Curated annotation (Swiss-Prot):
InterPro entries: COQ10_START, START-like_dom_sf. To polyketide cyclases. This is Putative polyketide cyclase. Involved in developmentally regulated synthesis of a compound biosynthetically related to polyketide antibiotics which is essential for spore color in Streptomyces coelicolor. Pfam families: Polyketide_cyc. Signal peptide: none annotated. Gene3D superfamilies: 3.30.530.20. It comes from the Bacteria.
């Protein structure tokens, strides 16, 4: 059995701002609440290889792994995968962005499978990722909408 999640949120902000803020990997610790640090290991055109390190969990364990992301600004999609898979057999993520009358819809689709010796199974991880994705997406929405509001205010003041 494999796990699959599909979550989306509408952000009341222009596509360009949402795209730029969510693809500025070095600033992810300020966008997501779960990441303590990001280290970019390499760049090749639209492909970025980086190490993510989370804040310690309730047991004090710090999780860290290497991922790759390939951003396509034309189709407004990002494809990512874990290079260091940890407890996963594989983990693939697709980020999709779409403009709507209300702003920008950001969608995360994750497909994965846990290793047989992982401490949790696919069903547990699916629930965990769904819960965490909703939390992180709401936080990202709030931070981007705040930045959009600050830009509107600065633009009005400059006029």
């Amino acid at each position: 059995m494999a796990g699959h999640t599909d979550n989306e949120i509408t952000i009341a902000a222009p596509m360009e701002l949402v795209w730029n803020m969510t693809n500025d990997i070095e600033k992810w610790p300020g966008l997501f609440s779960e990441y303590a640090s990001v280290e970019v290991l390499g760049r090749d055109d639209d492909k970025v290889t980086f190490r993510l390190t989370m804040h310690p969990d309730a047991d004090g364990k710090v999780w860290s792994w290497v991922s790759e992301r390939v951003a396509d600004p034309v189709t407004r999609t990002v494809r990512a995968q874990r290079v260091e898979t940890g407890p996963f057999q594989y983990m693939n993520i697709v980020w999709e962005y779409a403009e709507t009358a209300e702003g920008t819809v950001m969608r995360w689709t994750q497909d994965f499978a846990m290793k047989p010796d992982a401490p949790v199974d696919d069903a547990w991880m699916t629930d965990n990722i769904n819960r965490n994705s909703r939390t992180q997406m709401a936080l990202i929405r709030d931070r981007i909408e705040q930045a959009a509001g600050e830009r509107r205010t600065a633009s009005v003041l400059a006029d």
